[in-house]
């Protein structure tokens, strides 16, 4: 009977306990008395005693868990209650809240906002009319004298709270920031529309909140320009604990993944993107004045053309076919020149399925233009005028200082004073290597490829397969010529084997009328006199197709539509392209391309620990895009 009663007791306990909970308890109880020991061959009294021990242990364990849970909840409730009390009775500063764990802070802040909604207050109003920007306010009233208070002028401003300081219960200071400037809000109960509302609004506001302020311009006795509010409105509460400006936001992973937070806390980031915008604006204005027409071309193409690069592939459901993301807009531009639009340009995104490193991002911005009745000599002059004028317009000088290894590394002076240095690729390579290369007319032979291969091996210059002549030359140029280019330098007259879209050199057989502009060892521009012979163009496309078949993923496809367009006649034309991102890096002294992209490509956080970074070399031939 006792055994049956015990079994009923156990079954009752099982009914009250979920199987998941029972499984956990069984595992823990098994350490005291495993169920496998409760065997029928033991005497009944032993089995009864063992079962009692187990039930007693299970009960103690359950009581212990309940106490721990109750204690944790009690501590959290006490913390929440204390913080909630501070939220309404701490002179509005909320300093104690900022000692909390960020998760607790978020919970408390969310509850406070929910309470506002329940009470009928809208913490997210639809509209707040702003009379004057913070920048304009500072410009117009900075002349005030200490102690001035213009009670006859009432203005409305808005911004984000970055600091909150109480000087007693009736005087609270806020640092309001926006547009890269700071304005102090001097909230005094005497000037507010009512004492009760003064207390209420200041108890609500926290660092990070976006607020609207209606008040009078003034200056404190210490000379701090301020707005003295008659009324303040919560426009959008910040639910997260905002890092203090004193410490800033320095972690790069957080900065790149949460760019909005980076912009809130780091004004230098805002300045970089202002400079980026100025660069694009200057280029547009420069080309517009030369009579160029800005155009837009497709970003998804049946054939990826215009550059030697590996494309991204997507799929079009309706057409039931693969499409390629644009690697360069060049071929479309030249078709438009065939159609009679003699000067065209486009500023836009390109996509290349290649490596991510300090100077490469799979999605990047370029400017390309094509100019009928011009050659690469004309484009060198235009490049010098554009870049030197841009640098001087934005920085005030032709010379800039750049830190390629970061702020703590060595500083270099880059001089954009025209004219820029010019070197011929093959001649300079022979000079630096101290060897005589085969005649450029023989660069397409296997003998030349073997000579270049041997030079790379002897000089320990790495070149992953396929070790084609074009790739070997590109590696040698990168190793021995590009590294000498600190101030702007044109590397000119590339071999035809490296430039399937460029026109052959009018004086040097085997070469093309092409140049690349390097600054601080990095390519920023690429341009050439365009090949407009449809027969020769088709031959070069076929050679590229052979290279692709041999394993070169970056080799070009044959574009029949483009070849057909050339058959209608492309006038003598020169084409040019520049990487906006790299130019921005130099003018903002940034050594990482992620610093000048608002939302750079990043590995998913759960993969960043295990994924290995890959580095892909720059293309040996681009459209004039880089």
From Swiss-Prot:
Substrate binds at residues 306, 330, 368, 370, 526, 530. The modification Phosphoserine is found at residues 236, 424, 619, 623, 625. Gene3D superfamilies: Bira Bifunctional Protein, Domain 2, Nucleic acid-binding proteins. Phosphorylated on a serine residue after mast cell stimulation with immunoglobulin E (IgE). Keywords: Acetylation, Aminoacyl-tRNA synthetase, ATP-binding, Cell membrane, Cytoplasm, Ligase, Membrane, Nucleotide-binding, Nucleus, Phosphoprotein, Protein biosynthesis, Secreted, Transferase. The keyword rRNA processing does not apply. ATP binds at residues 352-354, 360-361, 523-524, 579-582. The modification Phosphothreonine is found at residue 620. GO terms for biological process: basophil activation involved in immune response; diadenosine tetraphosphate biosynthetic process; ERK1 and ERK2 cascade; lysyl-tRNA aminoacylation; positive regulation of DNA-templated transcription; positive regulation of inflammatory response to antigenic stimulus; positive regulation of macrophage activation; response to X-ray. Its main location: cytoplasm. It is found in: Cytoplasm, Cytosol; Cytoplasm; Nucleus; Cell membrane. Residues 604-626 are annotated as: Disordered. InterPro entries: Aa-tRNA-synt_II, aa-tRNA-synth_II, aa-tRNA-synth_II/BPL/LPL, Lys-tRNA-ligase_II, Lys-tRNA-ligase_II_bac/euk, Lys-tRNA-ligase_II_N, Lys-tRNA-synth_II_C, NA-bd_OB-fold. It catalyses: tRNA(Lys) + L-lysine + ATP = L-lysyl-tRNA(Lys) + AMP + diphosphate. It is a peripheral membrane protein. Its EC number is 2.7.7.-, 6.1.1.6. Pfam families: tRNA-synt_2, tRNA_anti-codon. GO terms for cellular component: aminoacyl-tRNA synthetase multienzyme complex; cytoplasm; cytosol; extracellular space; mitochondrion; nucleus; plasma membrane. Residues 611-626 have a biased composition (Low complexity). It comes from the Eukaryota. Belongs to the class-II aminoacyl-tRNA synthetase family. Catalyzes the specific attachment of an amino acid to its cognate tRNA in a 2 step reaction: the amino acid (AA) is first activated by ATP to form AA-AMP and then transferred to the acceptor end of the tRNA. When secreted, acts as a signaling molecule that induces immune response through the activation of monocyte/macrophages. Catalyzes the synthesis of the signaling molecule diadenosine tetraphosphate (Ap4A), and thereby mediates disruption of the complex between HINT1 and MITF and the concomitant activation of MITF transcriptional activity. It is likely that the same gene provides both this cytoplasmic isoform and an additional mitochondrial isoform. The N-terminal domain (1-65) is a functional tRNA-binding domain and is involved in the interaction with DARS, but has a repulsive role in the binding to EEF1A1. A central domain (208-259) is involved in homodimerization. The C-terminal domain (452-597) is not required for interaction with AIMP2. Homodimer. Part of the multisynthetase complex (MSC), a multisubunit complex that groups tRNA ligases for Arg (RARS), Asp (DARS), Gln (QARS), Ile (IARS), Leu (LARS), Lys (KARS), Met (MARS) the bifunctional ligase for Glu and Pro (EPRS) and the auxiliary subunits AIMP1/p43, AIMP2/p38 and EEF1E1/p18. Interacts with AIMP2 (via N-terminus) and MITF. Interacts with TARSL2. This is Lysine--tRNA ligase. It comes from Rattus norvegicus. The gene is Kars1.
